[in-house]
Every structure is written in C-alpha cells, then in structure tokens.
C-alpha cells in the first residue's frame, strides 16, 4: 500500500509541475546588445521607453545606476538604452542620425513604437528633449511620441553658461574650475556668448525660459525630475539654489504651464539621489521607477 501511495504522490507532483509552470524562456525578456544600444524586449509589449545616459556614461551605466529599465520591461515596456552621449546640444545631422538608429532598432527587432516615451539623465535629458522636438516636427516620424522626461538636466544653456562663469569666480572648490572652463569654451565655440548670440541659444538649446523655446512642446506630456538638496550642493560645490539645474528646470516648467501645457510636471524628490553608491542628488535614482512606469502606462492607453 505504501508503494501505491508513493506512486500517486509522484504522479500528482509531476502533473502539477507540467501544467502550472510556464517555461522560463517564454517569460524572460530578450536582450540585444549592440555597439550603439542595448534593447530589452518583453514577450508581450505595450510601450517603448528610450533612455539616454549622462555625459560620460553608456547603456550599461544607465542599467546599473537605476531600476527604471528592469522595472519597465517587467511591466511589458520595451526599453532601448542608447550609448549616445557627450552632448548637451546636437546638430540637425546628429539628431537625424540618432533618430535613424532608433528607427533601425525598431524595424530590425520588431518593436512596437506606437507608444514611445523618451527620457534621459543629465545631458541625456538634453538629448531627449532635442530629439522629442525633432520627432514632433518630422512629417513621417519613426516612433509615435507620447511623452518625454529629463532627470536633473542642464536644459537651459544660457543658465549653464552663467553658472559656469560664477564657478570660475569662486575661491572655493578649485577642482571644478576645469569643468567650468570647458563648458564656457565649448559654448563660446559652438554658439558664442549668450550676450552676443542670443538667437543661437534660442535655436540650439534644448529649452530656455522663453515662450519661443518651449512652444514646440506645449502639447506634449513632459516631466522634469530634480532633487534640489541645497544643503548638499552648498557643502560640496558652494552652489546656491539659483545655480542648480532645479532652478532652471522650474522656470522652464512654469513657462510651459503658462503656454497652456497642463501635462507638464515638475517633480522634486528628497533623499533619493545615489550615484555609484554614494549620496548625490544628481543621479538617475531620484526617479521613482514604479511611478514612472505607471505614467508611461497611462500615456499608452
């Protein structure tokens, strides 16, 4: 009798195992890695999220420094993490090249781009906003753009130029003066000074605190994420609030709202910023990945 009971127990366990477990490969997202991007593709896709890294970073950094990609793909959102970096502004040719890379990935891997959101951290937010503008003015865009977001990004290049000048004038934190010199020299070379070349900044900056600059995005859902920890910035960089990306992004947000964009959001956080394991308010981690996914899902309905 013991033999019979054991036989039936084994049979029941095997039956449950065969019927109740979906093969792992059917659930796991596909991962595609190329020199220009990493793609996470869920089995059942409902949206596409395109992410751009910070200035010296790449797709691997994006995934390592934030849970956004893995949380999104776990919820049926394909994630295209781009390696394109080192740009706070872009030429028209560069914009079309990156859009072409996105279009190529969508076509080659059968990605549904009918619900697309673009976002980036730091300079990656600059790239995201510039590409959003380019996609919106394209007669035949390769993706249907539903929203864009920037994470503590230096979108206002006039503000960035002026803050770099202030950094050079400070007697403290000499180690950051090289960065300020580089930014001023680069902007002088590319656009001229804001005082003498205001039209160039109006044309090339991702966003300025002006109606003309924000007008192309007045109907697009857009988010500005920032963690304005003024005590941290004062201690570590001798920066006041008006020198932070948070200050410039708030002005841009307010201008968008004044233009009639009811779906522009300025999102501040507290104590979330961690960069490479260390406390830093300028970080991917200030974004609540679960809430971001909910926002994307809402835009995709």
Features from the language model and the residues they span:
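C-terminal catalytic histidine-bearing segment of alpha/beta-hydrolase fold enzymes
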Residues: 90, 223-232, 246-301
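Primarily recognizes the serine-hydrolase "nucleophile elbow" in alpha/beta-hydrolase
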Residues: 107-108, 114-171
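Alpha/beta-hydrolase active-site loop
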Residues: 90-109
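Mobile cap/lid helix-loop segments that gate and shape the active-site cleft of serine hydrolases
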Residues: 56, 163-215
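N-terminal cap/lid segment of alpha/beta-hydrolase-fold proteins
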Residues: 20-44
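Proline/glycine-enriched tight loop/beta-turn segments at coil->beta junctions
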Residues: 41-48, 217-219
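C-terminal motif of bacterial Sec signal peptides marking the signal peptidase cleavage site
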Residues: 16-17
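Short substrate-entry loop that stabilizes the transition state in hydrolases
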Residues: 46, 51-90
């Amino acid at each position: 009798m013991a033999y019979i009971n054991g036989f039936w127990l084994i049979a029941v366990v095997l039956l449950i195992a065969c019927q109740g477990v979906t093969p792992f490969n059917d659930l796991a997202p596909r991962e595609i890695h190329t020199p220009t991007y990493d793609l996470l593709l869920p089995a059942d896709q409902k949206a596409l999220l395109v992410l751009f890294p910070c200035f010296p970073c790449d797709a691997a950094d994006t995934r390592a420094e934030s849970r956004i990609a893995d949380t999104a793909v776990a919820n049926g959102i394909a994630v295209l993490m781009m390696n394109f970096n080192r740009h706070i502004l872009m030429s028209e040719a560069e914009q079309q090249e990156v859009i072409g890379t996105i279009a190529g990935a969508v076509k080659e891997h059968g990605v549904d781009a009918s619900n697309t959101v673009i976002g980036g951290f730091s300079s990656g937010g600059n790239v995201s906003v510039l590409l959003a503008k380019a996609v919106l003015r394209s007669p035949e865009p390769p993706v249907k753009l539903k929203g864009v977001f920037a994470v503590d990004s230096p979108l206002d290049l006039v503000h960035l130029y002026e803050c770099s000048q202030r950094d050079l004038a400070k007697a403290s934190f000499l180690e950051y003066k090289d960065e300020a010199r580089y930014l001023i020299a680069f902007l002088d070379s590319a656009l001229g000074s804001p005082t003498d070349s205001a039209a160039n900044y109006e044309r090339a900056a991702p966003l300025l605190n002006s109606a003309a600059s924000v007008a192309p995005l007045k109907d697009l859902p857009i988010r500005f994420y920032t963690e304005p920890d003024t005590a941290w910035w004062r201690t570590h960089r001798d920066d006041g609030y008006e020198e932070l990306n948070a200050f410039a992004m708030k002005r841009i947000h307010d201008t968008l709202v004044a233009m009639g964009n009811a779906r522009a959001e300025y999102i501040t956080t507290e104590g979330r910023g961690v960069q490479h394991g260390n406390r830093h308010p300028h970080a991917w981690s200030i974004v609540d990945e679960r809430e971001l996914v909910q926002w994307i899902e809402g835009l995709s309905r």
